Amino acid sequence: MRLIIRAIVLFALVWIGLLMSGYGILVGSKVNAAGLGLQCHYLTARGTSTAQYLHTNSGIIGFSDCPIFRKIATVVDNG
């Protein structure tokens, strides 16, 4: 029972941190558009967000993988 309560408290703290900071955590990605596009899905405190990046295997032009964290445009607290 103590473990469940700690997990719920930890989840609440992470959610509040995401809400106040405006960051999202990567939850999924896929390569699209004949291998040239990279579509990344992020979980934020307000829902999910999708980002499109140019994809290359080398990472010189564009991204080879999705970033783990991404700043989302809408932030609850700017101060």
From Swiss-Prot:
Signal sequence annotation: 1-33
Protein name as catalogued: Uncharacterized protein YobH
Species this chain originates from: Salmonella typhimurium (strain LT2 / SGSC1412 / ATCC 700720)
Taxonomy of the source species: Bacteria, Pseudomonadati, Pseudomonadota, Gammaproteobacteria, Enterobacterales
Pfam families xrefs: YobH (PF13996)
Domain of life: Bacteria
Entry keyword set: Signal
